[in-house]
Amino acid sequence: MKFLADLEQLLVERRQNMPEGSYTTKLFQSGPQKILQKVGEETIEYILDAQNADKQKAVYEGADLIYHFMVSLVAQGWSLSDIIAELEKRHKPKGGG
């Protein structure tokens, strides 16, 4: 998880500084709709490789998917901790019998 936190911090810095020549900068400059389109494309690529049980390609596309998903979060001003908090909320033991 530390790596994902570090990656998120790098993405936040890229959004603030917009270094020239950075792929991430180009994504942020393209706007939220284009970023979300890229998330969709990477999702489809991951699904196709996973359905074909091609682990190497699925892992590669999964990494692309996570990266672009995180870019979409940062572009919206959201964070990975928002997603983690929701997952934790869903997995808390339910009260009662």
Spans of model-derived segments:
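Flexible "arm" and connector segments at domain edges
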Residues: 1-62, 66-97
